[in-house]
Amino acid sequence: MRTKAPRTSSPKSAPLQARSPRTPAANGSTNGSTNGHAKTNGHAKSNGAAAPAKRGASAAKTTSKSAAKSSSTQKPTTAKANSALRKASRGSLLTHETAHLFKAGAITTDSPIIYVNGRMVPKSQAMVSVYDHGLLYGDGVFEGIRIYNGQIFKCGQHMERLWRCAEMIRLRIPVSRDEMVQIMHDCVAANNIRDGYIRLVVTRGFGTLGLDPRKCPVAGVICIADQIALYSPEQYEKGMKIIVAKRPRTPIECLDPRLKSLNYLNNILAKVEAIDQGCDEAIMLNLDGFVGECTGDNLFIIQGGRVYTPPTESGILEGITRRFVMDLCADMGIPCLLKNMRPEEVKTADEVFLTGSAAEIIAVTQIDEIKIGSGLEGPVTRRLRQAFKAIVQGREIPQD
């Protein structure tokens, strides 16, 4: 019988009261916007506290007309993207500058089109202020989300986690959940993506030098829809080699592992350890020496036909793909249990695999110098990976 990790409620602390900057003109912004979420005519409000982006008739209208049809020299995929971009322009997300670049065909070499604080802009114009606290201090939260068959995988759960994480750091997201979902759909359509990846970022926003979050009037919102390939096709077929990092996970008492924040330095330094040893991933242990997770993926082992994964109390992120795979095990009649594990137990497992939004399911065939099982992707891992693929390649993608 599968057991679930206990869930704790998110803190309901009110967002911190923001103070408007006294000198908004000297904002250091690299895109001319004082706070993000500027009106969609491309001109930021002078008080540095513009309203959140809105769609349709309620949004500020662009003065430019819809761009002309794509020329016959453009590739079909580009023509489709242009059509989607015209649709976005009717929703007042395009700036004047972007509309002109769009007409000139610049987006054919300057993709993806990215949502930045109320505007859809080419990659070269997707900029934030150098005074944004997300850049200065890693103050913000994010989500990585998969797109399958043009649909957003587990959209509801990702939105729930994003808002929960924002509440944990007392950050007010300046758009509603429905508006955020629409932003994602607009980015997917503008870039003509059928299968890809969405990166949603919410920063504390433009502020001043210094940690005080009250100096940031409005949070920043960025949405990128693009392709992603963390690992090679060969690694998915043959499995990957990983290490056990010497650097432990940040203790739960210092930073709640459920918080998907912009500060990933602990993970990055463990990743550097792996790279130095010719590997792409590393297992991170908690201070008690138990296995937590990898730098960007959750970890599972298979022993005696049973699947095990560390509980959230071991200091891991509650991965959405992790939860989906646990439910998939139950549907397939494979026992899946939560268990604290030492690295030695993982190294002697029959099979090991990792899960993540970007990684999906990938086998681990070697840890440090120890071969896992036969040294090939194991039969249970293969069954789960194939079942996962069958679901996400189907017509109806799980969205809640």
Where are these regions (language model features)?
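Conserved alpha/beta cores of soluble small-molecule-handling proteins
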Residues: 2-12, 19-22, 27, 31, ...
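Glycine- and Gly-Pro-enriched alpha-helical subdomains that act as flexible
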Residues: 283-286, 290-312
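Secondary-structure junction motif
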Residues: 321-322
